[in-house]
């Protein structure tokens, strides 16, 4: 892996827990080589596009790359997942919780999230088993 160009998303989260190659290598117990070739990008989608174009290997958020992995456009070169600890929450004002449109939207978004989670779990089942 260290012989390849590593693609970096320079976007930083507020809490400082954005995935990074240094953290990934520490997570899997491999010494990080600072002489490794890097390409830096300012947005997650640019990193994904660079990986799709064959410019290097990227750390990708599973929800953003799951369809590319399923289609075979991208592959998982190392079966070691790195859980980010990020989560999503669906909230609404209390006075709108009875609104039929809001309830329907909540039902739909939960269904989409469950479908996405099912795809991700199926795709990454071997990655998490070996961590």
Where are these regions (language model features)?
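Generic recognition of short, well-ordered alpha-helical interface segments
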Residues: 16-20, 45, 100
């Amino acid at each position: 892996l260290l012989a390849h160009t590593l693609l970096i998303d320079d976007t930083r989260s507020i809490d400082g827990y954005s995935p990074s190659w240094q953290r990934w290598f520490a997570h899997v117990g491999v010494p990080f080589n600072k002489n490794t070739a890097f390409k830096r990008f300012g947005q997650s989608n640019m990193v994904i596009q660079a990986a799709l174009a064959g410019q290097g290997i990227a750390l990708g958020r599973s929800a953003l790359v799951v369809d590319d992995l399923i289609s075979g456009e991208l592959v998982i070169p190392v079966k070691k997942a790195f859980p980010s600890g990020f989560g999503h929450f669906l909230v609404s004002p209390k006075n709108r919780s009875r609104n039929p449109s809001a309830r329907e939207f909540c039902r739909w978004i939960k269904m989409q999230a469950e479908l996405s989670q099912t795809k991700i779990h199926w795709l990454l089942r071997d990655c998490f088993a070996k961590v």
